[in-house]
């Protein structure tokens, strides 16, 4: 499956001049410290992955004989590919009728799963779990589909410590305790997704692994410029192509109709995207900034909007014409904050058609 770069000459110039971000295979940098908590120093030195519980994400089960066709008309990606050719995890957005993102989701195939569950597991932002369920029920109509929440399951992210770990699979010592273990479909720099029983400890399941806290996980996301959840992707506001959905393998342009498809397809075929969600470094802590604050150039020209962040890292929707400039915004205390955008290494470097 091919991909398409939809940005113009201005951003290509940034890629050449800046070289993009350095690949952040090593999480133990000056900006991202992995804390060992109760692990010993000896144990941490042999760990290949850091394991993060993701309480801000939740899991739903969608099952029944119409599951695939039901989701096919709702999500941006192609359900016909899930569960085929070893593709067992798929990223997608759910759009409104105007073509704006409502929810970002990851789907996990349960095909051949021996543990009683079937259909797919749907990962979404936990703060909008009820809204997602309500939306699915509205579109369900008379389809043979069952919907349920899964409070007995826990979702984990396994982030690699090295390039070798990125390319390798986590060593699972007790496979019967793992419901799902799949590469994060958005980018290899996000490691692996694992779903287990809420009662199980990942350290008893994965060898050469140590626990980290969720803030470290978010810091890594913002450092590499990967959006997740309603804070980064405000429902009804974010446009999927501006949010780099193509780069995260989250959309099919050949699957046919789905809700919100018209605007997305038209934008794709014109090839014009003037703004993109980009990682930014900040001169002040993100906690002092308001979501949606306007970005400006030093000359006062509109340059985009700030979204969210942690510490001095964050995401902003940046006008590509100004992406290589030093930008500014006002903090909640009316102080001027400097904003510098970067081009992630995991973005494609040459134009390709998906």
Swiss-Prot record:
Subcellular location: Mitochondrion
Single GO MF descriptor: transferase activity
KO phenotype (gene knockout): Morpholino knockdown of the protein results in profound anemia without affecting erythroid specification.
A Gene Ontology BP annotation from the UniProt entry: heme biosynthetic process
GO terms for cellular component: mitochondrial matrix
A Pfam short name: Beta-barrel_CAF17_C
InterPro entries linked to this entry: TrmE/GcvT_dom1, YgfZ/GcvT, YgfZ/GcvT_CS
Function: Mitochondrial protein involved in the maturation of mitochondrial [4Fe-4S]-proteins in the late stage of the iron-sulfur cluster assembly pathway. Required for normal heme biosynthesis.
Protein name (database record): Iron-sulfur cluster assembly factor IBA57, mitochondrial
Origin species: Danio rerio
